[in-house]
Design a protein with these regions (language model features):
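SDR active-site lid
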Residues: 53-136
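Conserved catalytic-site loops of classical short-chain dehydrogenases/reductases
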Residues: 14-20, 61-66
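A structural motif corresponding to the C-terminal end of an alpha-helix
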Residues: 3-7
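Catalytic loop of short-chain dehydrogenase/reductase
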Residues: 9, 18-42, 47-48, 52-56, ...
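A short, exposed helix-loop element centered on a Lys and neighboring polar residues
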Residues: 1-2, 48
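Terminal hydrophobic/aromatic helix or amphipathic segment near a protein terminus
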Residues: 136-157
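Non-catalytic terminal and boundary segments that flank Rossmann-like NAD(P)-dependent oxidoreductase
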Residues: 90-93, 153-170
Length: 170
């Protein structure tokens, strides 16, 4: 952010910062993905702060948080362990490493019907969100709103915010 936002502001032109997060962390974390969820929660939080700062300083820049959504995304995220240095290996590695198909089966076993989202369609949706000056860009934001309200209620009652009954088991 420090590397490019000051230069964008100095240009005097309109612009937009789009940060990609995940519903896993930005909306409701999966308990077995704590590092990933934590990093995505941080992306969501810093984007919220950045957007507020850009508005407060009356710049010509906006900022949005993009949650790739609308179904399962068949991307390289499912095989990231192949890039992990051996000295940073997981203490309890998955064996075998779950695939996107494995996750879909686990979700369906938990009563969730998941479909795949076309990545080109998702990119068009994201660009439209930027044009519309939406802060949160997410397919199915209404469902996320319900989840966030439920989490807020559990937090307000000093309960665990994660609804374990809704977590797919791998």
């Amino acid at each position: 952010i420090q590397a490019f936002v000051p230069r964008m502001i100095a240009s005097g032109e309109e612009g937009h910062v789009i940060n990609t997060s995940s519903g896993d962390g930005g909306v409701s974390p999966l308990p077995y993905q704590s590092v990933y969820a934590s990093s995505k929660a941080a992306v969501s939080c810093i984007t919220e702060c950045l957007a507020a700062q850009l508005q407060t300083e009356q710049t010509k820049l906006g900022a949005s948080i993009f949650y790739p959504s609308g179904g399962l995304l068949d991307t390289g995220i499912w095989t990231t362990d192949r890039n992990r240095p051996s000295d940073l290996a997981r203490e309890k590695p998955y064996d075998p490493v779950p695939t996107v198909a494995d996750f879909k089966v686990a979700a369906e076993a938990a009563g969730m019907q998941l479909d795949f989202q076309d990545l080109d369609e998702l990119a068009r949706f994201c660009l439209q969100g930027i044009r519309d000056k939406s802060f949160v860009i997410m397919i199915g934001i209404e469902e996320a709103e319900k989840t966030l309200q439920q989490r807020a209620g559990r937090i307000g009652r000093s309960e665990l915010p994660i609804d374990l009954a809704e977590v797919p088991q791998l």
